[in-house]
């Protein structure tokens, strides 16, 4: 919920009487971030739970990883996930604004109004040209409807087979978000529909590499539990938790825009003369921060 004060949107809650009564789509899953002292208290509480009380396989693995500082890795299931990929890989991500009131034709209250996407193409394992294979689209203006231009940029940067299917695999984290936005754009622009849906139909979710997908791993040993666990995950698999485990040098901490909410607040304050997050003072600075984040 946002309030508008002194020409700038903020994260403060609006008054109850200003809330819309329209039925809103299911919100995206939010990560629970605990203060350091609360996390430490939780850790102490975990140690007080007797192993004899734990019957669930997931809980036993989590406790073992916590007690012994080890990692749980199901190599068989993870290998199977990789075998489903077809190159090139399109690392794809959207940013959207859940606007309370529809901004443009075809949108709904609290629907995701997309304003940015990033695409990084991995031609073969580890092969990605820094200039040619990296593309970011970011709306130039807040009040202009640039969705058609965005949709055209998407289909122009993916490759297709002669039969119209996607050449390769679209890759993302919690891919249902990206697939939903592609479907919405396909409904808006029938001339782009076939290619947008072709992208949707050949996708792989990084979440299923580390967490689980019972349907995908049906018939395999341990099909009902996660594929990877580390004590620092604390039960969650958001990219903000998993990325630092594998590439410690990459982190969202300290970024001018470091999460989805900050991203759309920077976007809707494009032309504000008030500082955003006490750092971003100009539109150019906000745009650059959004590009780095996405």
Named regions from a protein language model:
Residues 123-126, 160, 211-218, 270-277:
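Short regulatory "switch" loops immediately downstream of catalytic or recognition motifs
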Residues 71-75, 97-102, 187-191, 222:
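Short amphipathic alpha-helical surface micro-motifs
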Residues 83-84, 88, 109-111, 146, ...:
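Secondary-structure capping and boundary motifs in well-ordered enzyme cores
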Residues 48, 64-66, 81, 153, ...:
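Residues that form generic nucleotide/phosphate-binding pockets
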Residues 1-23, 36, 230, 234, ...:
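Acidic, Mg2+-coordinating catalytic module of metal-dependent nucleases/exonucleases
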Residues 76-164:
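Conserved RNase H-like, two-metal-ion catalytic cores of nucleic-acid enzymes
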Residues 133-264:
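Conserved DEDDh/DEDDy metal-dependent 3′-5′ exonuclease domain
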Residues 2-88:
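N-terminal accessory regions of nucleic-acid-interacting proteins
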